[in-house]
Amino acid sequence: MKVLWAALVVTLLAGCQADVEPELEVQEPAVWQSGQPWELALGRFWDYLRWVQTLSEQVQEELLSSHVTQELTLLMEDTMKEVKAYKSELEQELAPMAEDTKARLSKELQAAQSRLRADMEEVLNRLSQYRGEVQTMMGQSGEELRARLAAHLRKLRKRLLRDVEEVQKRMDVYRAGAQEGAERSVSAIRERMGSLVEEGRLQSLPSQPLRERAQAWGEQMRGRLEKVGSQARDRLEEVREQMEEVRGKVEEQAEAFQARFKSWFEPMMEDMRRQWADLIEKVQVAVGASTAAPSQKS
């Protein structure tokens, strides 16, 4: 029996020691201090979150309002905007790569971006939840709520760091692919130029100097440019004729409408003038008759 009690005491002491054992601090990524713009933006989000995690009196006061979540939201949007801009920049450099490779890399990076954004949004949701819990208190003390929040924020920071590292890895793969594609493109251009030079050297004849070949090439290019210019002028003239035709049709329709409107409006006005004249004449006759009646009575 004493052995069982001793074992129980040892177990309880070990559990208490495990509860109070300090948790290892998340290592701060040094690359955020001098990295890409998206890494610097993410560093600002990280620093602000670290300040929130201190749960100082100022932090606790600001957590009761929406100031902290609004600030973190702005930092999150700034970070994701920089990530998107850097991804677009790398995608432009990936042009020489195969389409299936580009699609695969883009899909992997997009998934890492989504996880990173989800981590940030979960931080915002947890802080909003804490504000609601403090306002209601739901039978819990403020110390308990702060302890739960601190533990949850530590887990979220670890997850955030893990997903940030994943985004960095995908960005590195993107960057390596862009460099490889650029080198492959330059190599292909160099080989093509070398083959053209060699071909020109083999085909050159002693009776045809390089200057004559250059002049012939220039005449050929001039002819092509003149042909293109002539085609462009013809097309422009065709468009101009079409515009003139459209304008003529519009003017014709406008004149026809004006004529129809005039044929409808003028008879109506003439009829109104005639009716008005008849009305005036009747009024004058009536007035004259009323004036003549007293004269006859006298």
UniProtKB/Swiss-Prot annotation:
The modification Methionine sulfoxide is found at M137. Its main location: secreted. Residues 260-272 are annotated as: Specificity for association with VLDL. GO terms for biological process: acylglycerol homeostasis; cholesterol efflux; cholesterol metabolic process; lipoprotein metabolic process; melanosome organization; phospholipid efflux. One of its GO terms (cellular component) is low-density lipoprotein particle. Keywords: Chylomicron, Endosome, Extracellular matrix, Glycoprotein, HDL, Heparin-binding, Lipid transport, Lipid-binding, Oxidation, Phosphoprotein, Repeat, Secreted, Signal, Transport, VLDL. APOE is an apolipoprotein, a protein associating with lipid particles, that mainly functions in lipoprotein-mediated lipid transport between organs via the plasma and interstitial fluids. APOE is a core component of plasma lipoproteins and is involved in their production, conversion and clearance. Apolipoproteins are amphipathic molecules that interact both with lipids of the lipoprotein particle core and the aqueous environment of the plasma. Homotetramer. May interact with ABCA1; functionally associated with ABCA1 in the biogenesis of HDLs. May interact with APP/A4 amyloid-beta peptide; the interaction is extremely stable in vitro but its physiological significance is unclear. May interact with MAPT. May interact with MAP2. In the cerebrospinal fluid, interacts with secreted SORL1. Interacts with PMEL; this allows the loading of PMEL luminal fragment on ILVs to induce fibril nucleation. This is Apolipoprotein E. The gene is APOE.
